[in-house]
Structure formats: structure tokens, C-alpha cells
A protein has these predicted regions:
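Bacterial N-terminal signal peptides that target proteins for export
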Residues: 1-8
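Carbohydrate-active catalytic/glycan-binding domains of CAZyme proteins
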Residues: 19-358
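Bacterial N-terminal signal peptides
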Residues: 9-18
Length: 358
């Protein structure tokens, strides 16, 4: 989830495209250090495109006098990233007057790119009962520009319809869409062959439910940001909770697993359907890490790509008490007993071996 309130909306600032963001210190040709993208880049979703580049997509942000609806960056190695600008430069016709464009995910099929995201419809400006919508846009290039299909995929109340992630299940051949928040469960539903609508007769299935707790070590009050990975006969559902932003941000990435892409899911410590099992949590200077994607490198290692807040510079600008500055980090996942972990259970600091890429 992202809460962004721009100070000024304008055309893209001159010179934005092609700029390289500063990243972690202490690197050598064989190492990297977090962050890999030291600019506000919330909810990062990474795609390895057929052109050989990695693309990262992120939630709306402000860059100087400009507002980027959905950000896109490109890399050859998952470490050095170049900001490319706005993947969705033109707002959809049903959300011209709003500013909430969140948590994109892009998939590639038959030479076409599908961008799934969430946005607040114009109707919500006059009707407080209206919440965010799931949406789809398409493009012929991974960097865009993406064009919305002209209608929401699904709308509802509050923040229920956010954080979509598309996944093609190799076992069943089904095209699936995961989403969810708003203090409700993570859901999945089958997409139709066109990938821009739900399959006829399909219904959403609840997968993992929030679990309110007074324990400050727990993160299950609100869960969001689904990402699915298949490995060794298991499907791993990553998700995050429970408060991404603000002075009291309290957030971590978690995981559950299942033998089926549509559940039931279990965690290491709790019964099926309950959240738990933190993969990466607060550590050192890094606060509120989460809302991750996962990408596999050329050696077969899995890397978790996520945002976190640098406690030394937590705000987007001086005097800004609204927008939390969430920057992009990566860490290698290690697998122990069939479960993924990050060494030290939190973001790394200092030099680490780079991902292996071709």
C-alpha cells in the first residue's frame, strides 16, 4: 500500500529520464550494498523482460515539480538502476482527477506487456463509500508507455482492491490474479484468456487472513502486497504487514506456502490461513521493510526486492510529515527446511556478493 499526497502535479521534469539514482556505498565489481535505488520507489515489482533487462515498477511519487503515476526503472544486473520516468503517463479516463496509483505489477506474454495496478476512481471524489479499483494497462515495450484498457477490472470499498500480482500456474495452465488488503484476506481469482478480465464463472478465493494482535512483534493486523513464487513443488506466497508508512511505520515481509497456487496456505509457526513467518524485518538503520517481489538470477538464487525506510532520512523532503521515503533494497534468499529467509532476518548493510546475471 502507498499513501502519497503530492505537493504539486505537473508535467514530467526535464532531464528525469536517463538519470541514475545513487545507491549503496562500499561496492566493488563483485559486490553491492543496499540501497540499490536511493530514491522514493515504493512497492517495487521486478520483471526480467525478453530484451534481457530487468525492469522495476513502483507506486506513484513526486519528483521535483512532477508527479509520476507509476514509476519504472531499468537494470542489467539488479544493482545499477536507471530511472526511466512514468510507465503510465496518461491517467485512465475513469481516474483523471485522483492521485492514488499504487503497487504495479507487469507480466509479459506473446510480445505484449500487461500492467496490473490499483487506483482511486473519480467517483470516490464525491462518494466516500467508493474505494480503490484493480486496473489493467497494456504496452508493447516493458518501459511503456502503458495505456489503460478504459475501465477498472474491479472496484470496491476502502483498500480492499489493491496490490495486484499476476501469475501463470504451470501446473494447471490457469492465469491467476492475487490481490488484497483493507484489513481483509489476500485473495486469488482466475483471469480470462485476454488477461484483462476475470474468467467467466470464476470467483475469488481467500488465501491468508489478517490476525490482529497486541504483540508489537506481530505484523498481521493488516496484510497486503502478495507475490507468488514456485519452487520445489511448493508455491510460496509472500505478503507484508501491517503499517507501511508514517512516523509509526511497523512493517515486515512474511511468507506462507502451499502445494497449490490457490491454497490452502500454511506458515511455519501458525495454522493454515494465519499470517506469520517473517522473512525480512526491521534491522539496524532499516525500518519497515516489505512489499516485495522475488526474482531468480542466472545461478538459480532467489533475490527479494523490497522497499525500506532509512531511519536517518525517513521523509521525502525536509518538513514533509506525510510522505515516507521508501527506497529499494535487495537481498539473497536462503532456503532452510523448505522456507525462505534473509540472513540476519533483516536488510543487509555493507558489501554483499552481487546477483549472477548474463
Amino acid at each position: 500500500m502507498h499513501r502519497f499526497k503530492p505537493f504539486l502535479t505537473a508535467i514530467l521534469a526535464l532531464g528525469l529520464s536517463g538519470c541514475t539514482a545513487m545507491a549503496g556505498e562500499g561496492r566493488s565489481p563483485a559486490t553491492y550494498a543496499n540501497p540499490v535505488l536511493d530514491t522514493d520507489f515504493p512497492d517495487p515489482a521486478v520483471l526480467k523482460a525478453s530484451d534481457g533487462f530487468y525492469y522495476a515498477y513502483a507506486t506513484q511519487t513526486g519528483k521535483g515539480a512532477a508527479t509520476l503515476n507509476l514509476q519504472v526503472a531499468r537494470s542489467r544486473d539488479l544493482v545499477e538502476w536507471k530511472l526511466l520516468g512514468d510507465a503510465l503517463p496518461n491517467k485512465p479516463v475513469w481516474a483523471r482527477g485522483t492521485q492514488d496509483f499504487w503497487a504495479p505489477h507487469v507480466s509479459e506474454h506473446a510480445g505484449r506487456y500487461y500492467l496490473y495496478y490499483s487506483a482511486k476512481p473519480d467517483a470516490a471524489l464525491t462518494d466516500s463509500a467508493r474505494g480503490l479499483c484493480l486496473a489493467v494497462a497494456t504496452a508493447v515495450r516493458p518501459e511503456g508507455p502503458f495505456t489503460d484498457i478504459g475501465r477498472p477490472l474491479q472496484c470496491g470499498t476502502g483498500f480492499v482492491n489493491i496490490d495486484p500480482m499476476a501469475f501463470d500456474d504451470p501446473e494447471t495452465g490457469k492465469r491467476l490474479l492475487y490481490w488484497g488488503s483493507g484489513f481483509g484476506p489476500i485473495k486469488v481469482q482466475e483471469l480470462g484468456p485476454d488477461r484483462i478480465s476475470f474468467a467467466s464463472g470464476s470467483k475469488p478465493v481467500d488465501l491468508v487472513h489478517p490476525a490482529p494482535s497486541e504483540d508489537p512483534a506481530e505484523y498481521g493486523r493488516l496484510i497486503e502486497g502478495a507475490w507468488l513464487v514456485r519452487r520445489g513443488g511448493w508455491y510460496y506466497l509472500f505478503y507484508s504487514g501491517d503499517n507501511c508508512c508514517g512516523p509509526k511505520a511497523h512493517y515486515a515481509a512474511m511468507v506462507a506456502r502451499s502445494r497449490s497456487a490457490t491454497g490452502p496456505f500454511e506458515t511455519r509457526a501458525l495454522p493454515a490461513g494465519a499470517p506469520g513467518n517473517v522473512v525480512v524485518g526491521q534491522r539496524g538503520i532499516w525500518v519497515a521493510p516489505g512489499h516485495n517481489s522475488v526474482i531468480e538470477d542466472a545461478r538459480g538464487d532467489h533475490w527479494i526486492v523490497y522497499h525500506a525506510v532509512d531511519s536517518r532520512r525517513p521523509r521525502s523532503s525536509e518538513g514533509d510529515e506525510v510522505n515516507t521515503r521508501r527506497i529499494m533494497l535487495i537481498d539473497r534468499l536462503v532456503w532452510r527446511g523448505g522456507w525462505p529467509e534473509v540472513e540476519g532476518s533483516g536488510p543487509s548493510s555493507g558489501p554483499r556478493p552481487r546477483p549472477v546475471v548474463r
